[in-house]
Amino acid sequence: MDTKHLIASEIQKVVPDMEQSTILSLLETPKNSSMGDLAFPAFSLAKTLRKAPQIIASDIAEQIKSDQFEKVEAVGPYVNFFLDKAAISSQVLKQVLSDGSAYATQNIGEGRNVAIDMSSPNIAKPFSIGHLRSTVIGDSLANIFDKIGYHPVKINHLGDWGKQFGMLIVAYKKWGNEEAVRAHPIDELLKLYVRINAEAETDPSVDEEAREWFRKLEANDPEATELWQWFRDESLLEFNRLYDKMNVTFDSYNGEAFYNDKMEEVLELLESKNLLVESKGAQVVNLEKYGIEHPALIKKSDGATLYITRDLAAALYRRRTYDFAKSIYVVGNEQSAHFKQLKAVLKEMDYDWSDDMTHVPFGLVTKGGAKLSTRKGNVILLEPTVAEAINRAASQIEAKNPNLADKDKVAQAVGVGAIKFYDLKTDRTNGYDFDLEAMVSFEGETGPYVQYAHARIQSILRKANFNPSNSDNYSLNDVESWEIIKLIQDFPRIIVRAADNFEPSIIAKFAINLAQCFNKYYAHTRILDEDAEISSRLALCYATATVLKESLRLLGVDAPNEM
């Protein structure tokens, strides 16, 4: 329990009618440390208790008895709490040394499923930086929910259906070279895709031809189906090579095509519930009562179903298959209106579980301030970017530690971790400008900075030949170690806050803060001096390294023991 919750629970014992959340919101940090570590103003209780705030403060101070406080005193209308830093430090360190990497594990989810729709790149297009965000945010959220007792189900809803396959088939039949595509599938398919889109801008017949090929694909035409399957298989091989490098796995690759035979049921359900309305020859669901101006377009006048129909089928399938407690869609900000419609249609269908569905939007990645677009060929491809990040990490490691064992393995952990961390430290709904040099830097608020702090601590522990024991009586009460203790104590609450807000950046910022606090401590403390407090200082080092490593793991980032 962190110090604020400790104080709130002690106050609540004295004033049981006051909600703990209210007490927490009222706690203040005094400007002057001589007035305690935290203070509670008693003004809000004056009306209910019909006493002066000064008397209430005095009553509360007298009744609180806990060995976690050096003293509790009333000063005017305030109750000032002076924490027993040595006692709390000892308690926190013993807990981390006992639990190890399981520290801060919780069972809030009780094993229930969380379906996470994430990554979802388009088949036959390269895996770009644009897909990085959905991949790493989704992967981190899976780790975070797992840590608090849920069972994450990671779903890669592949973009493996749609008119773009008509375009691709037209392009391949016009200019395609089977040998070239087999040798470099994604590169060649991208060239074809960009070329056919450029031609379509000046020649309207290209669009019509693409629509015709897509109609054939929908009708299971053998030639169209064979080409589609080939494009899909080749793309997936390439994607999986990248996922392996990024250390990301999935529980399902059911993409858009998987739901082709499941949309008829959606239409039947909507009809049976009298929700479909005709509008200009199309079938729609009106959603005005949900404050949504535009109706959900379910079926076009030519009989073609739409993206939302497929997502309705997917939502029904996932509910039946996974019986989820939460269903999360990690998809860009630009899809917000679509997901509002999706939830509203399910609500209209009387599916209360639609309340458990959440769109987790994120901002754009730009380059030099410009938006990226595969169609226009203005794109940062992930594979060469990861390779470049690993090379830059390798150069820095060579300069810092030329005799390091497993240099290639460490460079991969640092390079890949740098890209992931930079993405995840950004508030999810904000975008960021892609800057590889800033990402891989060992200075500043970066992944390598946090990894290096962890490796530095491991070096100290090796020198000291430290073996963790939770039976020793650890005691620290200096200012800098206390800052670290407070953060470590707060870690369980930080994880829950990250889960509640679907916000991995909360963990990333916590890790940066902890690394900075440790580096400050390291600069001012002779950790290995043989004196009465050496075992306490080493226990603090061990606890810090444990929490740093676990923070990074929750972000999908490795923490090498040497760098």
Curated annotation (Swiss-Prot):
Keywords for the protein's UniProt record, in alphabetical order: Aminoacyl-tRNA synthetase, ATP-binding, Cytoplasm, Ligase, Nucleotide-binding, Protein biosynthesis
Coiled coil stretches, renumbered: none
SUPFAM superfamilies reported in the protein's UniProt record: Anticodon-binding domain of a subclass of class I aminoacyl-tRNA synthetases, Arginyl-tRNA synthetase (ArgRS), N-terminal 'additional' domain, Nucleotidylyl transferase
Primary localization: cytoplasm
Catalytic activity reported: tRNA(Arg) + L-arginine + ATP = L-arginyl-tRNA(Arg) + AMP + diphosphate
Residue ranges of the motif 'HIGH' region: 121-131
Subcellular location: Cytoplasm
GO CC, any one term: cytoplasm
CDD domains: Anticodon_Ia_Arg, ArgRS_core
E.C. number(s) listed in UniProt: 6.1.1.19
GO molecular function, one term: arginine-tRNA ligase activity
Pfam family, one: Arg_tRNA_synt_N
InterPro entries: Arg-tRNA-ligase, Arg-tRNA-synth_N, Arg-tRNA-synth_N_sf, ArgRS_core, DALR_anticod-bd, Rossmann-like_a/b/a_fold, tRNAsynth_Ia_anticodon-bd
Family membership noted in the UniProt record: Belongs to the class-I aminoacyl-tRNA synthetase family.
Record's protein name: Arginine--tRNA ligase
Species name: Streptococcus agalactiae serotype Ia (strain ATCC 27591 / A909 / CDC SS700)
